[in-house]
Amino acid sequence: MKFRITVLCDNSVGPLSGTLGEHGFAALVEYEGGALLFDTGQGKTLLPNAQRMNRDLRGVAGVVLSHGHYDHSGGLWPLLQSCGGKEVYAHPGIFARRYAVRNRERSLSIGIPYTEDFLRGQGARFNFSEEFREIGTEMFLTGEVPRVTSFERGDSGLFCDEAGCSPDFMIDDQSLLLCTSRGLVLVLGCCHAGLVNTIELAREKTGQEKIHAVIGGSHLGFCSPAQLDETVKALRGHGIRKICGSHCTGFAASARLAQEFPGQFHPAHVGYTLEV
């Protein structure tokens, strides 16, 4: 099956004039006979960017929320207002309270900015599961990703409370898997579960060894140098053809990946399209 993945929301924009950037991520996954929206950004740029790129989101069959952070879910309400009710695939824990606490000095609420009841009232039809599942032809959600590597430790600045006492392990983090003739394509939100952990689960669950591409946020912009080193080693071992970094991959980690994988790494800014 063929897919076209277009980045609609990202921290940065590409060469297409008139598009807007914001801290967040959203990608439109188009396939024969339909389309799926993966994440929704913060809410300011999804609809304007889709319009600028001539993408009609009214025809989107469903929405996947990769996890319960504002910069991936904030555009859901504007989408529902503009395009009508949608089925929303998510982990049942996405509405948990979430905070970012940096240096024990400042606490920011970073959870979904709407309640579940409010979104249901706006037309969201939530389809919750924590399991690996098929949501369309050759399209799968990882569900909860087991943390098996020793070096992917998660973001130490994320908590379930304002005081920063209860770490948030982001168990709701999930990614989208597309099975293509070229191999697996992984669409990532933030990949809080770890890029290598997610790749290993994808291979195990689908039975496909070959990873053609990964696209989206990898959270490598928030990891230690040691974790980045180990991730580079693992990616090289998997022989991935395209590494398309967005959002929380960050500038420094993107520069490292571009150096380590010349011709294979691509900055996936707003407007970037991957066809497989």
Place the predicted regions along the sequence by residue.
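Glycine-rich phosphate-binding "P-loop"
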Residues: 1-17, 157-167, 216-220
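Active-site metal-binding loops of divalent metal-dependent hydrolases
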Residues: 10-12, 40-43, 68, 92-94, ...
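Cap/insert and terminal regions of metallo-dependent hydrolase folds
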Residues: 72, 87, 168-270
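Metallo-beta-lactamase
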Residues: 95-174, 237, 266-275
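Conserved beta-strand hairpin/beta-sheet module of binuclear metal-dependent hydrolase folds
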Residues: 3-53, 169, 173-188
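Short, structured coil segments at secondary-structure junctions
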Residues: 53, 83-84, 122, 239, ...
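Active-site metal-binding motif and surrounding structural segment of the metallo-beta-lactamase
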Residues: 45-95, 206-213
